[in-house]
Amino acid sequence: VYGAAPLFFSEHSDGGGFNRYFEIYNPTSDTVLLDDYAWARVGGNPTTVGVYETWNLFAPGAVILPHDVYVVAHTNADGFILNQANMISQLLSNGDDGLALVFGDEPATPTHPDSGLYTILDWVGNWNGDPGSGWDVAGVSEGTANHTLVRKCDVMMGDTSWTNSAG
């Protein structure tokens, strides 16, 4: 993807209650400005299958330093989590919400990624339907719910296929 750094979700947690967060990792030796990135999501059962419901921008001028992470945490998370957060939001997954790291501008109306108006860099879940309480991950039933997912150390970029990412 021209202009996009290979950022990806390095950690995703649905720790019960509001102890939810995700981490985006910058595997490069450059500081990455997040102005052209966003995290788009659907809540459980999507309104339109395959299309995001909310497009969430990072604060203008937000960056991820080289080989560092940017943490987005739920507004009501435990203080320990909030102290690590670069951004807070009430729109974090409870395990059954599809989350994508995207590069590009927000379309005027929610649009399928095949439109070419933005690029998916990585997934936690997908926007293709209600998974119940969560998606299965590496043989763990509903692994995105009430678990913390940590990417393997040798992963250096996101995966545009949730099926591949989930193992």
Segments (PLM) and residue ranges:
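Activation on beta-sandwich/Ig-like modules and their edge loops
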Residues: 2-146
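Extracellular low-complexity, O-glycosylation-prone Ser/Thr/Pro/Gly-rich "stalks"
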Residues: 140-167
